């Protein structure tokens, strides 16, 4: 499908089946746009350096003017016509130079509003037909870690990663997708009830400031939806990244070692019984690391307290080359995590509630890829907060990672179970407890990793395209997370 053709998508792909139509939409990516002969010619001949994020908004203009009617959402194309390209002739396909000049004059508010419209149109994430196309050419939270480490090949940035939803039903990926929805309900119904409006289904959030980064959020609070169905991020937005621990899934059977340890935790909820449960698998989800020592990258939760030192291993000392890691540990190590033990529906008339809660000295591992994932979410959400129409002026964004643990269904479970007032689907496992860990990102560490990732993005662009857009360091040099 040619974004520069006047041919209607209905004529181009309307007669295809749904799968082929989705393939065509996915192929309308930023990479394919940049490779188009018209775009390559424009970049090579334009009187100035073609730069980010302007060229990304040019891409959005041509994409949504082309497909808006076909996908049943013309809001983005209409916004461009009324607010950005209002001096460009309505008939025909406008010249690249004219659209680029118009997009170059956009202010931060307009950029933010376009990104919010894109978030709306991409809700549904991996089930959304535009998801792969719009993730292409961006460093998403799942790519941020290896982008800072300059790992993997350029195709990971500039070719779509098709998200296949035909995962093996008993495998960890399908398990994670199922359980994510359950934990959103647990958070919404049992944990975050005093908070303001929550967002369950967040689309793709392109960073409005640079056009290079993008994230999607599992669950957040203190975020509202306005009359136009667009998200409004308040200064005290809380973002929750959900991880479901497949290796701890157990049967409600005396033959299952995990179940025996869980029973101890359930009857006597405390740090001691939690440690016994966590260490009942060969590779525990929480790593003990003594003060002043370097953690491994094997898992994303750490503990300082000696009671976690059940399997002593030698650790390297933190040295001058680990300054960023040291600072991140200092920011996180004393925060602690909140553990919520959930009631067994078989003992509680089908109701899953918070049976008990306690605090433990568990914190985020700054060497793990999930720390980078949360860091980028923080950065992008902060830019939306800064550009938000929120009536609030006070508050600070908070970020959390939620570790969730489940058991398999048992014949003793009631046929219908509830989390708060919400019915639990009969096909999902039973949640037994969650660990909520706050994540703090030092500003200096965030700026350093952002700079590294941008450099990698530009290197990747040089390798992927003959003519490529420029990523000005002015976008990042001052470290402004809000305009």
Swiss-Prot record:
<keyword id="KW-0255">Endonuclease</keyword>
<dbReference type="GO" id="GO:0030430">
    <property type="term" value="C:host cell cytoplasm"/>
</dbReference>
<feature type="site" description="Required for function">
    <location>
        <position position="243"/>
    </location>
</feature>
<dbReference type="InterPro" id="IPR001616">
    <property type="entry name" value="Herpes_alk_exo"/>
</dbReference>
<comment type="subunit">
    <text>Forms a complex with the DNA polymerase, the DNA polymerase processivity factor, and the major DNA binding protein.</text>
</comment>
<protein>
    <recommendedName>
        <fullName>Shutoff alkaline exonuclease</fullName>
        <ecNumber>3.1.-.-</ecNumber>
    </recommendedName>
</protein>
<keyword id="KW-0540">Nuclease</keyword>
<dbReference type="GO" id="GO:0004519">
    <property type="term" value="F:endonuclease activity"/>
</dbReference>
<feature type="site" description="Required for function">
    <location>
        <position position="241"/>
    </location>
</feature>
<keyword id="KW-0945">Host-virus interaction</keyword>
<keyword id="KW-1035">Host cytoplasm</keyword>
<dbReference type="InterPro" id="IPR011335">
    <property type="entry name" value="Restrct_endonuc-II-like"/>
</dbReference>
<keyword id="KW-0269">Exonuclease</keyword>
<dbReference type="GO" id="GO:0004527">
    <property type="term" value="F:exonuclease activity"/>
</dbReference>
<feature type="site" description="Required for function">
    <location>
        <position position="218"/>
    </location>
</feature>
<feature type="site" description="Required for function">
    <location>
        <position position="180"/>
    </location>
</feature>
<keyword id="KW-1048">Host nucleus</keyword>
<keyword id="KW-0378">Hydrolase</keyword>
<dbReference type="GO" id="GO:0042025">
    <property type="term" value="C:host cell nucleus"/>
</dbReference>
<dbReference type="GO" id="GO:0003677">
    <property type="term" value="F:DNA binding"/>
</dbReference>
<comment type="function">
    <text>Plays a role in processing non linear or branched viral DNA intermediates in order to promote the production of mature packaged unit-length linear progeny viral DNA molecules. Exhibits endonuclease and exonuclease activities and accepts both double-stranded and single-stranded DNA as substrate. Exonuclease digestion of DNA is in the 5'-&gt; 3' direction and the products are 5'-monophosphate nucleosides. Additionally, forms a recombinase with the major DNA-binding protein, which displays strand exchange activity.</text>
</comment>
<dbReference type="Pfam" id="PF01771">
    <property type="entry name" value="Viral_alk_exo"/>
</dbReference>
<dbReference type="InterPro" id="IPR034720">
    <property type="entry name" value="Viral_alk_exo"/>
</dbReference>
<comment type="similarity">
    <text>Belongs to the herpesviridae alkaline nuclease family.</text>
</comment>
């Amino acid at each position: 499908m040619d974004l520069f053709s006047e041919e209607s998508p209905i004529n181009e792909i309307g007669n295809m089946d749904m799968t082929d139509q989705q393939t065509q939409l996915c192929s309308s990516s930023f990479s394919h746009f940049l490779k188009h002969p018209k775009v390559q010619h424009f970049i090579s001949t334009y009187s100035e350096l073609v730069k980010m994020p302007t060229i990304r908004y040019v891409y959005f203009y041509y994409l949504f003017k082309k497909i808006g009617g076909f996908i049943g959402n013309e809001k983005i194309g209409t916004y461009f016509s009324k607010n950005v390209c209002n001096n460009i002739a309505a008939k025909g396909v406008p010249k690249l130079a004219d659209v680029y000049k118009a997009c170059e004059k956009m202010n931060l508010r307009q950029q933010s509003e376009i990104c919010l419209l894109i978030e709306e149109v991409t809700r549904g994430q991996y089930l959304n037909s535009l998801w792969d196309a719009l993730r292409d050419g961006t460093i998403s939270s799942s790519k941020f870690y290896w982008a800072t480490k300059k790992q993997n090949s350029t195709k990971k940035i500039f070719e779509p990663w098709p998200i296949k939803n035909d995962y093996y039903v008993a495998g960890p990926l399908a398990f994670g997708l199922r359980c994510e929805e359950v934990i959103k309900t647990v958070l919404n119904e049992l944990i975050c009830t005093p908070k303001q409006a929550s967002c369950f289904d967040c689309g793709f959030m392109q960073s409005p400031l640079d056009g290079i980064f993008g994230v999607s959020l599992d669950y957040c609070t203190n975020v509202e939806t306005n009359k136009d169905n667009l998200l409004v991020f308040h200064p005290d937005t809380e973002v929750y990244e959900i991880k479901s621990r497949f290796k701890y899934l157990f049967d409600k059977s005396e033959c299952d070692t995990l179940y025996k340890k869980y029973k101890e935790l359930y009857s006597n909820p405390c740090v001691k019984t939690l440690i016994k449960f966590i260490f009942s698998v060969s590779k525990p989800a929480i790593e003990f690391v003594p003060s002043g020592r370097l953690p491994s990258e094997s898992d994303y939760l750490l503990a300082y307290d000696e009671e976690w030192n059940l399997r002593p291993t030698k650790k390297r000392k933190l040295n001058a080359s680990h300054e960023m890691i040291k600072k991140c540990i200092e920011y996180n190590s004393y925060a602690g995590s909140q553990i919520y033990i959930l009631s067994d529906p078989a003992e509680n008339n089908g109701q899953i509630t918070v049976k008990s809660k306690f605090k433990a000295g568990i914190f985020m591992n700054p060497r793990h890829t999930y720390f980078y994932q949360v860091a980028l979410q923080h950065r992008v959400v902060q830019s939306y907060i800064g550009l938000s129409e929120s009536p609030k002026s006070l508050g600070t964004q908070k970020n959390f990672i939620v570790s969730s643990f489940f058991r398999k269904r048992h014949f003793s479970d009631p046929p219908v179970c509830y989390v708060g007032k919400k019915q639990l689907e009969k096909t999902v496992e039973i949640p037994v407890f969650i660990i909520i860990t706050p994540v703090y990102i030092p500003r200096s560490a965030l700026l350093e990793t952002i700079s590294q990732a941008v450099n990698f993005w530009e290197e990747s662009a040089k390798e992927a395209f003959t003519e490529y857009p420029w990523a000005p360091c002015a976008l990042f040099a001052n470290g402004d997370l809000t305009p």
